[in-house]
A protein has these predicted regions:
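Catalytic core of non-heme Fe(II) oxygenases with the double-stranded beta-helix
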Residues: 70-188
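Non-heme Fe(II)/2-oxoglutarate
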Residues: 1-92
Length: 188
């Protein structure tokens, strides 16, 4: 369905995939000792010159040969054409990254600063389209992805795949969770 804000969500039935991604992240977290956590996770660290603090665990699955990354790309290939058809001319070429970032946000954790995914710095300047797959259900009123310009919130629901432009026009944040962990997979 075409919306005036270029934010589209599709309820997939990828529940088993969601469970496997969560299990893989939890396995990775439990295998790390304290000396390695800082290299792979943002657990109370501060980024962007001290302006943005966050408390969550994230891991970038970078290997294109990783079965979970390959499977995520297959899922994206099912839904990106729908988005491209609705918004023809958006320019979907090369919109899938090689990286799948998986995050676990504990209660009262997260990254709540307004931000956009496309930035001037070299590591984010190529981003055009953001996708987020919510890996678990979150109670209403918690953990939404909120878009400031549109007064819109996307409620996390297991298997929900959300697409939106990475530009400043889609400045957003993740709202806090209070009662459970929140898991997402995301990329650009």
């Amino acid at each position: 369905m075409k919306t005036p804000n270029f934010i589209e969500s599709y309820q997939t039935e990828q529940y088993d995939f969601c469970d496997r991604v969560i299990a893989r992240l939890e396995e990775y977290i439990s295998s790390q000792d304290d000396s390695n956590v800082a290299m792979h996770f943002m657990n109370g660290s501060v980024t962007n010159g001290g302006e943005q603090s966050r408390r969550d665990y994230s891991f970038n699955f970078q290997a294109m040969q990783d079965p979970l990354v390959v499977e995520m790309h297959e899922i994206l290939r099912q839904y990106i054409p729908n988005y491209a058809e609705i918004y023809n001319g958006f320019g979907m070429q090369g919109c899938m990254s090689e990286t799948m970032k998986v995050q676990k946000t504990p209660p009262k954790g997260g990254f709540h600063t307004w931000h956009a995914e496309h930035a001037r710095n070299e590591s984010a300047s190529w981003r055009n389209l953001t996708w987020t797959l919510y890996l678990n259900d979150i109670p209403d009123g918690e953990g939404e992805t909120e878009f400031i310009e549109y007064g819109m919130k996307v409620q996390p629901k297991k298997g929900l795949l959300c697409f939106f432009p990475a530009a400043w026009t889609h400045t957003h944040r993740g709202n806090p969770v209070y009662s459970c962990d929140k898991y997402i997979a995301t990329g650009w």
